Structures are given as C-alpha cells and as structure tokens.
Design a protein with these regions (language model features):
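N-terminal accessory regions of nucleic-acid-interacting proteins
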Residues: 1-42, 46, 260
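Conserved acidic
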Residues: 34-37, 41, 52-100, 107-702
C-alpha cells in the first residue's frame, strides 16, 4: 500500500483483492435488456515513455468502486483483470465497464496485448484507432469517457474532491516500470483515475443512472432526456415517423447537410482593420428550433429537372426542399464577401471554375451543387447566374416543431439564463448546445473497422455512401488490399434504410437547424453591409466601423416571434430573448481596436475586456493554443501572416508507430509491449499547416 493524499492505494493484485471484500456490488440491466453490468464505476489510465524507436506503458492505474490501484507491469494489470473476471463472474453477458478519458491513446498501446489474452467481441470506432468502446469475451469492457463529458479531464473533474492535478508529467523523462515515482508523480497518476471516478459517480447521481442505464455519450444523454418528453406524445411520434426518408432522399439530404458558415471577406484578408465591432446570436441553433418552421409531414419527390420558378414557388407557399441543382454560368457578384457555394457541396468537377476562395467557389461554366431552399436563398442573392434547375430533389411542408420537442429546449434556455450557479445550470447549458447534434446524426454513418493482430493493427473505412449504395468497383480493390473481408457489396434495401431511422430524431430537423442559422447569419451580413463585413463564424459576424442601428429592426422581429412562441425569459427586471443578434461589446463604441484575419479559423484582434477596461490581444488559430497564439504574435497582430511559425503551439503531436508484440528483457522483469504513440511538441507553420494536418494527426492532449 502507498498513501496518496487521503487515500490508501494498492500496489499489488493481492492488496486489491483483499480490499475488494469491503465492496458489495450487484449487477443491473436495462428494463428490456438481457445483458447485465456490475454496478460499480471503474476507471483506467496509463502513463507512457515514448521515443523515436521505442514506446511502452510504465504505470497502469485504475479505480474500482473508489479503490485505487497503481501497477507497473502489464502482466500485473492483466492478472488484476483476470482476478476481477473471476471475482464478479464476468462473461460476455455480464460485464464490468472501465472508463478511459480519451481511450484512443490507451487503446493503441494495449489492444494487441489484450487481444493476445482474450477475444475482442465488439467495438465501435468513431475514426481509425478511436474506439467509443471495445469489449472482450471475458466481460471486460472499456469506454471513452471523453465522449460522455465532451470536455477535458481537468474540466470534467472540476469540483471533485480529487480533481485532476494542475500541470502534466514531464514526458521527456525516460521512465520504465522500475523507475520509482515521486510523491507528486504518484498523486498525479492516482488523481487521474479517482477524479474521473468521482466525476462519473456525480453524473450518475445527478441523472439517476446506474451502470446499465448510463448512455455512451453526452449526445445520447440529451436524446434520452428529450425522448422522455417526446415519446409520450403519440402525435409527435407520428410526425417523426412521417419524416423518414427513402434511400434517394436520404442521400440528397446527407449531401445537402452542412455546418456553420465560417469565412472571411476575401477583399479584407491579410490586412489590419481599425475600430471594429461584432454581433453574436444568442443560442443560434436552439433559437431556430424554437422560433422557425421546420419540415413536417411525408416528403415527396420533385419531378426531374424541376425549374427554378417551381423551386421559388415552393418557398413562397411556405414549403422547403432539398435538391441536387445544376447551375449554369454563375459568378459571384462584385463586392459580395460570402461565396455561399462550398466546393465540398459540388458533385464532381466545377466546369470552367473561375476561382476558389478558401474552399468556396467563385464561379464557373456549370456545376451540380447540393443545397436546400435556405441555402438557395443565400445563393441567388450572392451570385449572378444564367439558369438553375433541380436535377433531383424532394420537398416538404413546414410547421413549428411539436411542443413536446420544444419544451425541453425552452426549459434548458430558462435555466441557462436565470439559474447560473445552480446544480442544473451546466447540464442545461450542455443540453442546449447538444440538441442540434442529436438531430444532425446520420443514421447511416461511416464505419471504421480495425483488425488486431500480433504484427500490428489493420484499419479500414466504409463511407456512408458505400454502405447505402454498395461498394463500387472502383473501391473494391482498396478494401481487398487491407486483407479484411469486404462488406457492403449490395445496396441497402428501402426497408433497411427505414429501419435505421426508426428511433432517431428526423435528420431533416438537424439539416434545417444549421441551414436556418446560415440564412440568419447571411441576413446580418447584409445588414452590416458587404463592404463592412470582415469575418463570420456560424453565429457571429465581425465588421468594420460603427454599430448598425438596422440590427435593432432585425431584433425587434425576433423579440416579437419570441413573445408569440412563449420563449421569453424573465431575468430580474429584464427580459431575455433567444435568437437576437447581441452586440458583443455594448458599453463602448468599438469592441475591437484592431482586427486581422487570414482565412477561416485564423484571426487575431485587440478586443475590449470589460473587467480590465482595456483592449487586450486575442488570437484564434486552428491548431494553436490561445496562450501560445498570443505569445507568438509578440504584442502585434500584424505578425499574423502567411509566414508565421510557432515553435510551441501548445499540446502534443501524436505520431503512431505500428509494431508487433515483443517480449522484452531490458527491465527487472520480462514484459510484453507492442504498438505505441510518440508524443512530440506541437509546432505550427502557416505555410505547411494544411499539408501537415492531412498527414499527421494533431491533437491537444487534455
């Protein structure tokens, strides 16, 4: 035993076995489930040494029901798991779950070793080598708690008795399983697992979960919460069922789906602008779901080559549509800062393309473009063009979302705005931010497959298109080359496609939420003026010069709609309206003394800080930490340029080394190691960032 703060920590398997006698743990299952779970919260973590030629774990720390253990050799950890399997009579239908915060790291180090001892019977990957969970035949299951909290371990354990300790271990020190740990290092290891245990226990208590009912992800938690309201309302269930899409409609909808509009005025890029301001929508995505009309009823297919006049008529009559459109001879209007056609939404090559602006198409002789009727309204105001038709598409009626769906949204907004500091505040805020994601989930997703061998890890990926339509001949050999069995040789049937949508929120609601937010942002860009708009990102727009009184007219309409829909929150003697465009710095004439951007997700400013009453340098550069970005600018935003190089961009770069299992004898005891990840200081070079990001995974280790 070893002491860590107020804890007695086991250092051997017999010590753990003896202490487990003090814990009584039964099994639980879902009401309609057959699988049982040991009703204990368990957590796991490792610390590693890694070099250019070698990498291994030198600590294996875990917490079972509040009892912490730190072991130094993999074989001891394996024996500990075997003891737990025997003690709790685990098997494939009776499981014990261990949570790992950012499980991809531990997975890569240990999966070959674990598979050598036990059969991997189930796993779900969100990307190559990134499991949401993985399960063995002996009943041991690992889950990624990062997806459960959607925040770093430090933030997830805030307020816990044993929160993650400040700072990181010095990863440059070469440690082995035989290296004695200082008290500080030991405490660091312990807090990583006991703190996570406390955070999950808190989550279970707040939401009345047990180990069988706790969802895998935060989004799943939100879905369960909304379902408690929605599934009791048979009328709402019928509305959602009617919105199920057939295979052709689903493919068009997936192609039309897009995120936030993040872009900068190409005429203003690379220059520093004085005296700027910003508007920011209040809860942009949830506001659309509360205030706007959404797809309802059974969608119907439009005729082939539907004319633009007919498409416009749908909009005038209060309907919406999604389509693959052909646009003939189009060109961005002079002075328009926001080319609304993303190159990723064009099918095939844009014929006669006249130019790209940070991934946006400026014009062309002709192109097939996926868009919905909201994006069409942006397009027709942004471009000059000769003709447009819908080669294929479908339409639908619009109406307000059902009250049973809107109620959890407005309830969360009320708590977020009026009950800050209450126990429900953080969950309501997270729920409000996740409701869009709950609707925007593809029911047919990319599928990642991993085959674990003694020699290494083999990965493959099937796109949602391959799953829906069957693997095309052009891709068949690529899948065969992995050595894995080829799947999805035949397209899905309409019945199979319908089944994927049965228990999900309508995908059209997620699609419509984001496109309505893009349309509202477009309206604000027009109000502040094309010549003044600088940079915008999903729900905010930065612009040059004085504040725009015209925005007040826009907000008056939003406030009136809030009153109509019962979405007004009373906060003291004030009323709060969701969806209004708020002045980011209302107390002063100019919120930004200086503003400069290069492209999407790359800007710096001198923004007003009301706490200090002064302007302060700020930076947002994708792939660079906030502090490191500010330091690199050396007090001058003009240093944000295409030649910017940052020695220390914050976080670590991960370099994957695929290795066979080997038994090594360079430690006091023989031990097995396999593949590993090398952690390197992360640098940033503006000139090569895009190329490097395509070939090397850049991850902030939290």
């Amino acid at each position: 035993m070893r002491t860590s703060q107020d804890l007695q920590v086991c250092e051997t398997v017999p010590e753990l076995q003896k202490r487990l006698y003090s814990i009584r743990a039964g099994t639980v299952k879902k009401p309609k489930g057959a699988r049982r779970y040991v009703n204990l919260t368990c957590t796991f973590d490792i610390e590693t040494t890694n070099t250019e030629t070698d990498g291994f774990a030198y600590t294996f720390q875990f917490c079972v029901g509040g009892i912490c253990t730190v072991l130094r050799y993999y074989e001891d950890f394996r024996n500990a798991l075997e003891m737990l399997v025997h003690r709790y009579r685990l098997n494939k239908n009776t499981r014990m779950v261990f949570y790992i915060h950012n499980a991809a790291y531990e997975y890569y180090y240990l999966i070959q070793l674990l598979c050598q001892d036990w059969q991997l019977i189930d796993a779900l990957y969100t990307k190559n080598n990134k499991p949401l969970y993985f399960v063995f035949s002996n009943g041991i299951e690992f889950r990624d708690s990062l997806k459960l909290f959607q925040k770093s371990l430090a933030r997830a354990t805030e307020g816990c008795k044993h929160a993650k300790l400040v700072g990181d271990l010095d990863y440059s020190v070469y440690r082995t399983p035989d290296t004695p740990l200082t008290q500080q290092e030991f405490d660091y290891c312990v807090n990583d697992v006991i703190g996570l245990w406390e955070a999950i226990e808190r989550l279970k208590k707040e939401h009345k979960y047990n180990q069988a009912t706790i969802p895998l992800t935060q989004t799943a938690m939100v879905i369960d919460d909304i379902n408690n309201s929605v599934r009791q309302d048979h009328k709402t269930v019928k509305i959602m069922q009617d919105l199920a899409l057939d295979p052709v409609q689903l493919q068009i909808a997936y192609q039309c789906m897009a995120g936030g509009d993040t872009h900068g005025n190409r005429y203003k890029a690379g220059h520093t602008w004085m005296n700027c301001n910003s508007y920011d929508f209040k809860s942009a995505h949830p506001s659309q779901q509360l205030l706007q009309k959404f797809p309802t009823g059974k969608p119907w297919n439009m005729d082939k080559d539907t004319s633009e006049a007919e498409l416009s008529a749908f909009i005038r009559h209060g309907m919406g549509w999604c389509a693959k459109c052909f646009i003939y001879q189009f060109q961005i209007k002079p002075g328009c800062p926001d080319p609304t056609i993303s190159n990723s939404k064009c099918e095939g090559i844009v014929q006669g393309c006249t130019g790209l602006d940070n991934g946006r198409v400026l014009g062309g002789e002709g192109a097939f473009v996926y868009m919905d009727s909201n994006d069409y309204q942006r397009f027709r105001e942004a471009y000059n063009y000769k003709a447009l038709i819908a080669a294929a598409g479908f339409a639908f009626r619009l109406d307000y979302l059902p009250k049973s769906f809107r109620k959890p949204i407005i309830d969360s907004f009320i708590i977020k705005e009026s009950m800050k500091g209450s126990p429900d505040y953080m969950w309501s805020k997270a729920k409000l931010n996740s409701i869009f994601g709950a609707c925007a989930q593809k029911t047919i997703r990319d599928e990642y497959i991993s085959a674990v061998t003694d020699a290494g890890i083999v990965n493959d990926r099937y796109s949602w298109q391959e799953k829906l339509n069957g693997v095309p001949d052009s891709r068949l050999q690529l899948h065969k080359d992995t050595g894995l069995d080829v799947k999805y040789l035949e397209p899905m049937t309409p019945e199979e496609v319908a089944k994927t949508q049965e228990k999900k929120f309508p995908f059209l609601w997620g699609l419509w939420t984001s496109s309505m937010t893009r349309l509202c942002l477009w309206q604000i860009i027009k109000i502040v003026g094309w010549d003044r708009a600088l940079y915008w990102d999903t729900d905010s727009v930065k612009y040059i010069g004085e504040k725009s009184p015209e925005v007040e007219a826009y907000n008056a309409k939003v406030r009136a709609q809030c009153e109509k829909m019962g979405c007004v929150v009373t906060k003291g003697d004030k009323k709060v309206y969701i969806g209004v465009a708020e002045d980011e710095h209302p107390s002063i004439p100019y919120g930004y003394r200086r503003f400069r951007f290069l492209h999407a997700k790359c800007y710096a400013d001198e923004g007003y800080n009301p706490k200090t009453g002064d302007y302060e340098l700020e930076s947002t550069i994708a792939g660079v930490g906030k502090k490191e970005g500010i330091a690199a600018l050396k007090g001058n935003i003009d240093n944000l340029s295409e030649t910017l190089y940052i020695d220390d961009a914050g976080g670590k770069m991960l370099e994957y080394h695929d290795c066979p299992i080997k038994t090594r004898s360079d430690f006091q005891r023989p031990t097995c190691t396999a593949s590993y990840i090398r952690m390197l200081p992360r640098t940033y070079d503006m000139r090569t960032w895009k190329e490097k990001a395509a070939n090397t995974e850049e991850t902030l280790l939290t």
